[in-house]
Every structure is written in structure tokens, then in C-alpha cells.
Amino acid sequence: MGAQLRVYKRRIRSVTATKKITKAMEMIAASRVVKAQRKVAASTPYATELTRAVTAVGTGSNTKHPLTTQAETVTRSAVLLLTSDRGLAGAFNSNAIKAAEQLTARLEAEGREVDTYIVGRRGAAHYNFRERKVTELWTGFTDEPTYADAKKVAGPLIEAIEKETADGGVDELHIVYTEFVSMMTQTAIDARLLPLSLEEVAEESSTQGEIRPLYDFEPSAEDVLDALLPRYVESRIYNALLQSAASKHAATRRAMKSATDNAGELINTLSRLANAARQAEITQEISEIVGGASALADATAGSDR
């Protein structure tokens, strides 16, 4: 076997092994997307009813709360960026990071200081490489987030917005995450999470023509709001974590499918080259045999004379 043919066969074996790996990763990502979508659907009724309850308390009373009160002058903002712990997801992380940087630039242009909170190792690696300050970091759960993870993330953020800016607090909280639209479309978006605009929440939760019930609050509207608002923030962060997880798995599936298809095309190309090399080798051997036979025939004819 010629040296060139051996090289082609070795490359075909290597690419075939890679194709098997990418195909397996594609199938795993596809199953995880389905699980993440189910979790989003399962959490929706709870989030909807919680939103209605918060709206009822906020709009049905004159209660003021730190999480719903807009500062007269906003001097410091917090940005929560949701990325993944792992790569191999195409432009998933880079799009989220780009959206966060654009939001940060916009807030700084308005004269605000920005504290950055990050979920996921990929986002942390980006900021650490550029020596940018990260106020707090959470990792290890981005593939399959739970409500407990959302609660862990929400705690420091709620504490920060309840503090005065002079004591290290912030005036508002923005979140940047990737919204799952479909298996083929995922969009990095930013949204202001706190302080909560009760009017916007009421519009989101209301159905046209719906008659809203009247509520009595015990022991008081203030106590109910104190209990509900942190749960509302946790549910919003949990939904964003689930959306990001589904988007990441969809991006991984798409990237691995592309890699599998490219590997198949490369195997076909290498197979054609290997066949051409084999044919050239066979042709060379036949030429050598014919040439040798011809020379032998000429030598035999000469000796007969």
C-alpha cells in the first residue's frame, strides 16, 4: 500500500470516529431540549398565577416596596448575564455576551455605574480574560437549572437592590439571557427586572375582557407583598435560566448536526481521493508488469537470434 493511500485511510478513520462523537452529542442535546421545554411549560402556570397575585397586591393597594419603587436618580445598575458552563454551542454564548456588553455601554453612557453578575463559566472566562470585575458568579447548573438555583441567584440581587447605593446597593437590575423561540431560533435579549413596574406586569398578566377578582390581604398588603415579590423575582430568573438552557441545547444540537454533516462530506471526499490513489497505484503496478514483460520478451527474442 502506498504512503498516500495510508494517509487517506488514517484520516478517514479519524473523521469517522469524530462523526460518531458529534452524532451522539447531537442526540443528547436533542433530548435535553425536550426536557428543558417541558420544564418551561410546567413552570408557566405557577409564574402566571404569581404574577396575577403580585399585580393584585400592588395595584389594589397603595403599598410601596423597595422592589417596586423607582429611584429619583439612578446612579448604579446591576446586570445579570446568563451563559453556559460548556461550549460547543455555536454563537450561543457570544451573542449573550455581546448583548450584555451593549447594555452595559448604554447604561454607562447614561452616567450609571454597572455591577456585573454572571451565571456560567463561559461568561466568567470572557470577563476574566479581559480583566473586568465580576461582582458575583454562579456555575455548575446551567445545563439543568432548578428552582433552588434560581433562588440562590436571586438572593444577592434582591439584597443589592434593597440597599442604598452608598452602602454598595444598586438602583435597578437588568437581566440578559437567551430566549428560546424555536429549535432553529434563539434570541439574546435584555430586560429590566427590578424595580418592578406594576403597570407593565398587569398588562402582561391580564387577558382581554377578563374580570379580575377582588382580594382581601391578611395580615396586611405590605406583608403579602414582602412575601410575594421575592418569589416573583425568583420565578422570573428561573424562567430565564430554563429558556437559556433550552436555547443552549438547541444551539449545541444545531452545531453538532452541522459538524456531523461536514464530517460526512469530508469522509466522502477522502474516500474519492483514496480510491483515486488506489487506482493510480494499480495503474502503476500494471504499467510496471507490462513494462517488465515487454523487456523480458525483447530479451528472449534477442537470445533466440
From Swiss-Prot:
Membrane disposition: Peripheral membrane protein
Subcellular location: Cell membrane
Protein name as annotated: ATP synthase gamma chain
Domain of life: Bacteria
Entry function: Produces ATP from ADP in the presence of a proton gradient across the membrane. The gamma chain is believed to be important in regulating ATPase activity and the flow of protons through the CF(0) complex.
Pfam families, A to Z: ATP-synt (PF00231)
Homology family: Belongs to the ATPase gamma chain family.
The protein's assembly and partners: F-type ATPases have 2 components, CF(1) - the catalytic core - and CF(0) - the membrane proton channel. CF(1) has five subunits: alpha(3), beta(3), gamma(1), delta(1), epsilon(1). CF(0) has three main subunits: a, b and c.
Primary subcellular site in the record, as a coarse category: membrane
